[in-house]
């Protein structure tokens, strides 16, 4: 089972809702995992769900709270395989003295792609086996700095990781939306889900 930290929002009727993105769930299923939605609510209940999962995905979203950071800290402290996407990556970075910047007048567009450069000594390079790839852009904020290892950059930090954990990797882009046509993005989910379930090599 692969847990996904759910996002909170309000319906048009004003009801509180929690959700995971379909592309995230589909990516997990494609590589043999079972997606488990995890509500960020009561701390102990959330941890109980997390401890039943082989790995955790921190999906993208608009906002986060201290509750989210506390959960991310738990994931790191307990060496639970963790993949952070967009805001998820930013939360991982913030946990380690990270600073965020804002992109003024930015328009989200999953069809817009740009090139990033991957550190050849990083886990991300081990997974993708290329030092330059194209990724999409949807974020309004970006990570200026963090004490975690920076594994990919463009004009901003694009990926971070910890070399002290079995898998603690965050990416600024949305690989789940590129699964249908980009084999390199598939490799991220294949490695993470397979490793979480069967063990990392």
Stretch-by-stretch model annotation:
Residues 96-101:
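Post-Walker A helix-loop "phosphate-sensing" segment adjacent to the P-loop in P-loop NTPases
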Residues 134, 149-151:
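A short linear hydrophobic-aromatic micro-motif
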Residues 1-87, 94-95, 107-121, 125-128, ...:
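N-terminal beta1-alpha1 cap of cysteine-dependent amidohydrolase-like domains
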